[in-house]
């Protein structure tokens, strides 16, 4: 599809509401306005007008807003029609626009308005992604950080790194251009000092980006264990409500239950699973297989044991089959010794060579705050994101790649035995992957993936 087409889409959620908005962008916007409204509204002024179909029938009445290029969200001529939020009314108005004679207007693809804003230099790629992140924010802190990204906080940090790398490259390439002259650009210590400064600044951005990624995506916590050890009780204790059915009958939970909570602004996706055991029940077997699938994708596993029937404080003596199914080294596990109210164990968190275990009571809630603190610490989430920004996995990957290139450049420099061309190439590669974050360098495939995840009207 061409980026020169005029596009239209509903900018408000599908369904009934007090207000429904259609957004039009492109070169035929003025013609659409004259056909539907009978006039071109005054730029950036709200006008109350009738919305008509091609036969002149009034479909609705509402507010029309016209934003001429380039002073609009997309950088193109944009018209917004704000009418009543009934789906039938909006559908009739949308059909009227699409069926205008001698005017080519099509339905926008998901994220196409934001994509055009990016292509017309109204937003960089980080800011465009922040539009979707602001809409999808699940916590107040995530919304604030998404707004910071939209305002350019993250982009500014990346551009400062790129600018520093540009300075370094100029300095090194100058030494290559004047290699036959009696001018030594590389012996005054500036390269080493500047390179160390860039590496330090990049490390700070990476640390903040990891916090931003946690805030955006949250942490997936899977509650696992044998039947009837208190998994569902722990889910209820963490969420603060009776989310799961709790009985003394083993196998009560047969499917995956999902809930979301917050710890100091960080979203946690808590997943309760079926008790893991050998069974002949075909329905329970399906639930157990789903439990394993969730376990394999977890950021952290809370493996619960009944403290009143077991004295073990690590998972592997309790269940050797666990290690056969999943690798011990890559599984972040916290052992939960439940029912401290029955055993009399002290509510506490203990670190051992085998891992971490917490004694608590899911029934009374004793030790739940300790578990919350533990989850926050294990993910490295500080909770202090004042002035911070959100980040995505692709941002973290680009920052990690840039760090590797810079460390390679630093090692070459420290060895004292290097070619200036190789040093300059490492810096160029670092600069290139950083530029991919903001979209200064990007592939069409990457843009398609990013913008296709947006809602239609954005």
UniProtKB/Swiss-Prot annotation:
(6S)-5-formyl-5,6,7,8-tetrahydrofolate binds at residues 23, 80, 122, 458. Pfam families: MMR_HSR1 (PF01926), MnmE_helical (PF12631), TrmE_N (PF10396). K(+) binds at residues 228, 247, 249, 252. It is found in: Cytoplasm. Disulfide bonds: none annotated. GO terms for biological process: tRNA methylation; tRNA wobble uridine modification. Its EC number is 3.6.-.-. InterPro entries: G_TrmE (IPR031168), GTP-bd (IPR006073), GTP-bd_TrmE_N (IPR018948), GTPase_MnmE (IPR004520), MnmE_dom2 (IPR027368), MnmE_helical (IPR025867), P-loop_NTPase (IPR027417), Small_GTP-bd (IPR005225). Gene3D superfamilies: P-loop containing nucleotide triphosphate hydrolases (3.40.50.300), Probable tRNA modification gtpase trme, domain 1 (3.30.1360.120), tRNA modification GTPase MnmE domain 2 (1.20.120.430). Its cofactor is K(+). Residues 218-380 form the TrmE-type G domain. One of its GO terms (cellular component) is cytosol. Exhibits a very high intrinsic GTPase hydrolysis rate. Involved in the addition of a carboxymethylaminomethyl (cmnm) group at the wobble position (U34) of certain tRNAs, forming tRNA-cmnm(5)s(2)U34. Belongs to the TRAFAC class TrmE-Era-EngA-EngB-Septin-like GTPase superfamily. TrmE GTPase family. This is tRNA modification GTPase MnmE. It comes from Hamiltonella defensa subsp. Acyrthosiphon pisum (strain 5AT).
């Amino acid at each position: 599809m061409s980026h020169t087409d005029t596009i239209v889409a509903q900018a408000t959620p599908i369904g009934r509401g007090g207000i429904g908005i259609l957004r039009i962008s492109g070169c035929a916007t003025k013609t659409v306005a004259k056909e539907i409204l009978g006039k071109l509204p005054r730029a950036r002024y709200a006008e109350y007008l009738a919305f008509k179909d091609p036969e002149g029938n009034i479909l609705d009445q509402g507010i029309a807003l016209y934003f001429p290029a380039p002073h609009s969200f997309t950088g193109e001529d944009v018209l917004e029609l704000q009418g009543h939020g009934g789906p039938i009314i909006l559908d009739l108005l949308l059909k009227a626009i699409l069926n205008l004679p001698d005017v080519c207007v099509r339905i926008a693809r998901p994220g196409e308005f934001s994509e055009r804003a990016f292509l017309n230099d109204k937003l960089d790629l980080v800011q465009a992604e922040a539009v979707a992140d602001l809409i999808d924010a699940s916590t107040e802190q995530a919304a604030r950080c998404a707004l910071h990204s939209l305002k350019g906080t993250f982009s500014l940090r990346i551009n400062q790194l790129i600018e520093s790398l540009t300075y370094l490259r100029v300095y090194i390439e100058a030494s290559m251009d004047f290699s036959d002259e009696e001018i030594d650009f590389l012996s005054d210590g500036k390269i080493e000092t500047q390179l160390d400064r860039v590496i330090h600044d990049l490390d700070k951005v990476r640390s903040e980006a990891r916090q931003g990624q946690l805030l955006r995506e949250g942490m997936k916590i899977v509650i696992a264990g044998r039947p009837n050890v208190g998994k569902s009780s722990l889910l209820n204790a963490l969420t603060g409500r009776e989310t799961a059915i709790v009985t003394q009958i083993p196998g009560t939970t047969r499917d995956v239950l999902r809930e979301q909570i917050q710890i100091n602004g960080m979203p946690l996706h808590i997943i309760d699973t079926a008790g893991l055991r050998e069974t002949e029940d075909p329905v329970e077997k399906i639930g157990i297989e789903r439990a394993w699938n969730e376990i394999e994708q977890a950021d952290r596993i809370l493996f619960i044991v009944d403290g009143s029937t077991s004295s073990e404080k690590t998972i592997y003596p309790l269940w050797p089959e666990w290690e056969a199914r999943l690798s011990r080294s890559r599984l972040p596990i916290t052992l939960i010794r439940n029912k401290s109210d029955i055993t009399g164990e002290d509510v506490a968190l203990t670190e051992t060579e085998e891992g971490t275990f917490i004694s608590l009571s899911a029934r009374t809630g004793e030790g739940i705050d300790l578990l919350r603190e533990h989850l926050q610490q294990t993910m490295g989430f500080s909770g202090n994101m004042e002035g911070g920004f959100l980040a995505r996995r692709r941002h973290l990957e680009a920052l990690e790649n840039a760090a590797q290139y810079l460390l390679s450049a630093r090692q070459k420099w420290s060895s004292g035995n290097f070619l200036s061309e190789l040093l300059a190439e490492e810096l160029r590669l670092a600069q290139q992957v950083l530029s991919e974050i903001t979209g200064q360098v990007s592939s069409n495939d990457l843009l398609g993936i990013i913008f296709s995840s947006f809602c239609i009207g954005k």
